[in-house]
């Protein structure tokens, strides 16, 4: 079942949203989040698999499986290179977190009522960036 029905999608788009989640749900006995991740990730080297359990194993469980990112960012010191999924690259200098904030301002997202309250930017940061958060570690 697609949770984000056509009418909801069109309404969000007309409101100026340009980042609208598409959600699919299915009975847990037909497929597992891990098996879905393994199938999708075998076609793409970049992706994210997040799982959560709220209220016990059988209640409120949700998973996020995301592949084929819009862009990838690689940081080396004060230089951050953004590579779009079409291969185009941009090089920026400055604080990686400030740069990321500026990049994400253009995305106007909407949340669906039946989704948990989560962000819509997924990825990972390298170990070296901990010094920007906890300088004494």
Where are these regions (language model features)?
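Signature of the chorismate-utilizing enzyme
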Residues: 1-137
């Amino acid at each position: 079942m697609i949770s984000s029905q056509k009418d909801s999608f069109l309404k969000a788009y007309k409101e100026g949203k340009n980042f609208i989640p598409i959600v699919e749900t299915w009975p847990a006995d037909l497929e597992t989040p891990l098996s879905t991740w393994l199938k999708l990730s075998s076609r793409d080297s970049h992706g994210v698999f997040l799982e959560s359990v709220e209220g016990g194993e059988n209640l409120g469980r949700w998973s996020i499986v995301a592949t084929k990112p819009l862009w990838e960012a690689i940081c080396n010191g004060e230089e951050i290179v953004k590579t779009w999924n079409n291969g185009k690259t941009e090089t920026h200098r400055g604080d990686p977190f400030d740069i990321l904030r500026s990049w994400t301002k253009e995305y106007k997202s909407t949340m669906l009522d039946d989704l948990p309250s989560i962000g819509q930017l997924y990825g990972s940061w390298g170990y070296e960036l901990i010094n920007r958060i906890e300088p004494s570690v």
